[in-house]
């Protein structure tokens, strides 16, 4: 399979990032290698983005089919363009991956599933999306910008209680100065509201009493993004929901970009691979007594030095795979 995927990749790499280089897929060949596409396979790409992973998967088998899902309508439109030539082999769904299988009736069990978590290059590079700290961007950060029920970053920063802000930066940004930062934000908004990424970065300057590093800024923006989009809750629910629809022998490949995501994936895959899940105090096994599946590779797969050199945003990526029994 590896040679087949490598050769298919060479043929399709040019268009894998989508129109306007929407997003360069990370760990592309490695992910499809572990999925092991089959001719009659039925797959889920729960974060289709620019369509890179789905495109290579479809190129690796003549008749396999994919459900291409994304909560970002802009991403879905790009994926439709990239994957247009595959016709009815692709079904496009605008939804979150933790909800799609409840909304989209399956014809049968999934042969495999892919999740590529995190923010796409397109989302980072578009000022109006508000995900980046590098430009004077509006503080939005909603993955689905059409969903008016989602709170924006501007609303959280200007309306959330100080204690809630502290918790957000501590739990989701792992920021040791979360209390001081929350207090600074509340003090600032009493005078003028925080409306742009520059406004937030200016508060970081005052809090740290120096120029914050890009890594420090990224942690704070990450914390807000996770909160707004319920990313960790979505991941926990989505992993379990997708597992339930995997067929025997199906592979589940998940690419994470920070430790909070990776812990959840690692813990879930490990739990599903245990032969006994009874509480330690139980004298006799009272559960199913059989592992749901296995982790074919205990350590996460990192991008090669060459991939990182060509795509710096791949640096923090880690691929984990679970295979259903």
What role is predicted for each listed range?
Residues 1-325:
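S-adenosyl-L-methionine-dependent methyltransferase catalytic core, i.e., the SAM/SAH-binding region
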């Amino acid at each position: 399979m590896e040679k087949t995927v490598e050769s298919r990749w060479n043929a399709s790499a040019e268009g894998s990032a989508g129109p306007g280089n929407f997003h360069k897929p990370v760990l592309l060949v490695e992910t499809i290698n572990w999925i092991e596409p089959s001719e009659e396979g039925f797959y889920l790409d729960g974060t289709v983005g620019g369509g890179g992973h789905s495109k290579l998967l479809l190129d690796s088998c003549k008749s396999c089919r994919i459900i291409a899902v994304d909560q970002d309508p802009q991403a879905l439109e790009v994926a439709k363009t990239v994957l247009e030539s595959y016709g009815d082999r692709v079904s496009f769904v605008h939804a979150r991956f933790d909800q799609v299988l409840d909304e989209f009736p399956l014809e049968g069990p999934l042969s495999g599933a892919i999740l590529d978590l995190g923010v796409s290059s397109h989302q980072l590079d578009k000022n109006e999306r508000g995900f980046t700290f590098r430009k004077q961007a509006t503080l939005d950060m909603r993955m689905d910008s059409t969903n008016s029920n989602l709170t924006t970053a501007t609303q959280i920063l200007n309306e959330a209680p100080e204690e809630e802000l502290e918790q957000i930066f501590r739990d989701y940004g792992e920021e040791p100065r979360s209390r001081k930062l929350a207090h600074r934000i509340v003090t600032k908004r009493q005078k003028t509201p925080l409306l742009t990424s520059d406004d937030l970065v200016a508060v970081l300057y005052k809090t740290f009493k120096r120029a914050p590093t890009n890594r420090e800024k990224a942690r704070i923006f990450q914390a807000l993004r996770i909160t707004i989009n319920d990313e960790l809750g979505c991941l926990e629910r989505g992993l379990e929901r997708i597992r339930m629809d995997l067929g025997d022998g199906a592979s589940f490949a998940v690419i994470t970009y920070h430790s909070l995501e990776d812990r959840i994936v690692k813990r879930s895959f490990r739990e599903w691979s245990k032969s006994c899940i009874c509480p330690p105090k139980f004298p006799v096994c009272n559960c199913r007594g059989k592992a749901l599946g296995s982790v074919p590779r205990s350590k996460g797969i990192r991008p090669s030095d060459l991939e990182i050199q060509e795509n710096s945003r791949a640096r923090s990526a880690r691929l984990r795979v679970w295979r259903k029994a």
